[in-house]
Amino acid sequence: MNNQMDIGNPTRTRAILEKYGLSAKKSLGQNFLTDPNVLLNIVDAAEVSPEDDVIEVGPGIGSLTEQIAKRAHHVLAFEIDRNLMNVLDETLSPYDNITVVNQDVLKANVNEEVENHLDGKRRLKLVANLPYYITTPILKTFMASTLPIDKMVVMMQKEVAERLTAQPGDKEYGSLSVVVQYRMNTQIEFDVSSKVFVPRPKVDSAIVSLTPRAGWEVMPEDDKDFFKTVHGCFMHRRKNIWNNMQGLYGKEPEIKAKIQNVLDDLGIDPQVRPERLTVLDFIKLHNRIQIEGLKRK
């Protein structure tokens, strides 16, 4: 099948939308990608091969799904919009290695669907053009899952991509940066102009790759508790770490003494702002807080 016939070709996309009387649903964050080169570049960035089974979220009319299916062993796509199921039945009919389930991925038992539709013998990847309004929940769901995902390559709002990949000292660096980079290596692969979507969104996008980290030299006992510490430290970005910790744990003399002990032991300047601390700094900070017995108010 050549590019002229591909779903992602602008002419064919319009024809499909007209045939089915479709219009993008803002409530579901739908924007249809109509640039074949961008679609191919996404699949290239994911390094999809016949050795891979791929999970996709929000296939839409199948533009990206098709390109993934040309290279992957099998594609398991989650589509929340029931009205698109008949469309996908037609547009993806030439391919026998695609399974589309009509489910909200945030409510679905993804592990069960993977077990039912994929053989578990191949590498597992997530490749998707994510709805902007649920990008972060979807990423957190897959990062926290027990699925052995080898790589994620996802399109998202450029602003969110910059936050995910920001480094200490960057203005975009925040709790999301720390929480994601605690588990994943992140990299912006390339930017995507709003011009290549129908309808055209108000913001540009970016393709981000995420690969699992092996771990850190020290680890927190409980991830969720660690994340609460991180979010708490960033609650007031303009405040230094000393003031933020007092806001979290209290200002009583004995509490302030414990906070001072924590910072002194770690060599952290009390006047530094949280966006200057590395992921490892936050892990050590959290662990030391636990040892000191500090409890959030």
Curated annotation (Swiss-Prot):
Keywords: Cytoplasm, Methyltransferase, RNA-binding, rRNA processing, S-adenosyl-L-methionine, Transferase. It catalyses: adenosine(1518)/adenosine(1519) in 16S rRNA + 4 S-adenosyl-L-methionine = N(6)-dimethyladenosine(1518)/N(6)-dimethyladenosine(1519) in 16S rRNA + 4 S-adenosyl-L-homocysteine + 4 H(+). SMART domains: rADc. It comes from the Bacteria. InterPro entries: KsgA/Erm, rRNA_Ade_diMease-like_C, rRNA_Ade_Mease_Trfase_CS, rRNA_Ade_methylase_Trfase_N, rRNA_adenine_dimethylase, SAM-dependent_MTases_sf. Its EC number is 2.1.1.182. It is found in: Cytoplasm. The keyword RNA-binding applies. S-adenosyl-L-methionine binds at N31, L33, G58, E79, D104, N129. GO terms for molecular function: 16S rRNA (adenine(1518)-N(6)/adenine(1519)-N(6))-dimethyltransferase activity; RNA binding. GO terms for cellular component: cytosol. Belongs to the class I-like SAM-binding methyltransferase superfamily. rRNA adenine N(6)-methyltransferase family. RsmA subfamily. Specifically dimethylates two adjacent adenosines (A1518 and A1519) in the loop of a conserved hairpin near the 3'-end of 16S rRNA in the 30S particle. May play a critical role in biogenesis of 30S subunits. NCBIfam families: ksgA. This is Ribosomal RNA small subunit methyltransferase A.
